[in-house]
A protein has these predicted regions:
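Phosphate/nucleotide-binding beta-alpha loop and adjacent structural elements of enzyme active sites
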Residues: 16, 23, 27-348
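N-terminal membrane insertion elements
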Residues: 1-27
C-alpha cells in the first residue's frame, strides 16, 4: 500500500524507475565484466600456447627462401576427412597402421605443420617443396632413399601432380613390410603403376650385399640400421639366426638408370648419408637438381658440409640435429635437415 502511494508521486516514481535502470545497467556491467574476464583468460591461454610454440627448437632453421610461404602455397584447403585414414595438409591419405601412435587418427585431418607434425618440420617440408617448385614445368621426378611407407614419394608426388606436372617417384627400402605400406599408400593416393618404381634393397654408393634387421611386425621399428658390405661369415650367421634379411646393396647409379634428371633426391638411410653422397658425387652433380638429406649426427652434418664445399652447390636449408644433453653422453633425439641446390640444373 505504501509503495503504491509513493509511486503515485511523480518525483518518487522517477526515482524508483531510475533505481531500476541503474540495477539493470549494473547487472549488465557485471555480466560484461565476467565475459571480459573469460575472454582475457582465453587470450592468456592462447598467448601462452603461442609462446610455447615459438620456443620450439623446430624454428631453429636457416633458409635463403621463405619456407613458410613455400609451404602455404602448397597447402590444400577445404579437405574432407576419409573414413579410416588420416588426411594431411597436402591432401595425402595416410593409413594409421604404419605407426602405432596413429591408431586413433582415422577419419581426421592433420593440420598445417607449424612448426612440425608427427612426420616432419618446416625445414624438411619446405626444402622438399622447394625442389618441386624448381622442377621443369611439365614433370617431376624424385628418388627417396630409405623410403619407408613412401612418405616423401607420396607427399611430393601429390604436391607436384597438383601443379599439373607429370610425376615419377622412385623409392628404395630394406624392410619388405614397409615396402608393402608404400605400395598401398601410392595406390591409395592415385599413383598409377607407371608413375612409381620401388626397389627392395639397401641404397648405397656401390653394389654389394647388406644385412637388414628383421622385425616381426612392420611399422613398429623405424630407423633400423643395415650392415653394409656384409662378409660371407656375417651372411651365414644372419641366415642361421634369422635376425637379418640378406639384401642387395643397390647403387645410386642403378636407381637412376637412364634418367637424365632427378628433381629431388631425398636421403634418409640411418647414418650412411655422407658416404653415399661422397661416393656418388660425380653422378649427383651431373643428374641431381636438389638434395634433401636427413642427418643423423653432428659428424654427418660436418662431413656433408666438407664434401659439398668442394662443389658449386648451394645450401638453401639447414636445421641441425637435436641432442638431449641431460645424460652423461649426448643422445640424438631429432635428425637434422640439409637442403642443397645444384645451380647447374636448377633455376637461379
Amino acid at each position: 500500500m505504501l509503495k503504491t502511494v509513493a509511486l503515485a508521486v511523480p518525483s518518487l516514481r522517477r526515482l524508483y524507475e531510475g533505481r531500476n535502470k541503474l540495477l539493470i545497467q549494473l547487472n549488465a556491467e557485471i555480466t560484461r565484466s565476467q565475459e571480459l574476464e573469460d575472454q582475457l583468460q582465453q587470450l592468456t591461454s592462447e598467448v601462452a600456447a603461442l609462446r610455447a610454440i615459438e620456443r620450439s627448437p623446430f624454428f631453429a632453421y636457416y633458409a635463403n627462401f621463405d619456407a613458410l610461404d613455400t609451404m602455404r602455397r602448397h597447402e590444400v584447403h577445404n579437405l574432407v576427412p576419409t573414413e579410416g585414414f588420416q588426411t594431411n595438409w597436402l591432401g595425402v591419405k595416410v593409413d594409421p597402421k604404419i605407426y602405432p601412435f596413429l591408431a586413433d587418427s582415422g577419419g581426421t585431418l592433420d593440420p598445417f605443420p607449424y612448426p612440425a607434425n608427427w612426420h616432419a618440420d618446416i625445414a624438411e617440408w619446405a626444402a622438399a617443396l622447394q625442389a618441386v617448385d624448381n622442377a621443369p614445368r611439365d614433370s617431376f621426378t624424385m628418388i627417396e632413399l630409405g623410403c619407408g611407407w613412401g612418405c616423401w614419394m607420396n607427399n611430393m608426388g601429390v604436391a607436384a601432380r597438383r601443379t599439373g606436372r607429370k610425376v615419377h617417384v622412385i623409392g628404395v627400402e630394406g624392410d619388405e613390410g614397409h615396402l608393402q605400406f608404400a605400395r598401398e599408400a601410392l595406390g591409395r593416393n592415385s599413383f598409377g603403376a607407371h608413375e612409381y618404381t620401388l626397389h627392395h634393397g639397401i641404397a648405397a654408393a656401390a653394389s654389394g650385399t647388406a644385412l637388414f634387421p628383421r622385425q616381426e611386425r612392420a611399422g613398429h621399428s623405424w630407423g633400423l640400421e643395415p650392415v653394409f658390405g656384409a662378409t660371407e661369415e656375417q651372411q651365414v650367421q644372419a641366415a642361421a639366426s634369422g635376425s637379418h634379411d640378406i639384401l642387395p646393396m643397390i647403387s645410386l647409379a642403378d636407381v637412376i638408370g637412364p634418367l637424365g634428371r632427378i628433381d629431388l633426391l631425398h636421403i634418409d638411410i640411418q647414418g650412411g648419408e655422407a658416404e653415399l653422397v661422397e661416393g656418388c658425387l660425380p653422378l649427383i652433380k651431373e643428374k641431381v637438381a636438389y638434395m634433401v638429406i636427413g642427418t643423423h649426427s653432428k659428424h654427418i652434418e660436418a662431413r656433408l658440409f666438407d664434401i659439398m664445399a668442394t662443389t658449386e652447390w648451394r645450401i638453401e636449408m639447414e636445421r641441425p640435429a637435436f641432442y638431449q644433453v641431460t645424460s652423461t653422453k649426448p643422445v640424438l633425439i631429432v635428425d637434422g635437415v640439409q637442403g642443397w641446390r645444384n645451380p647447374a640444373l636448377m633455376n637461379s
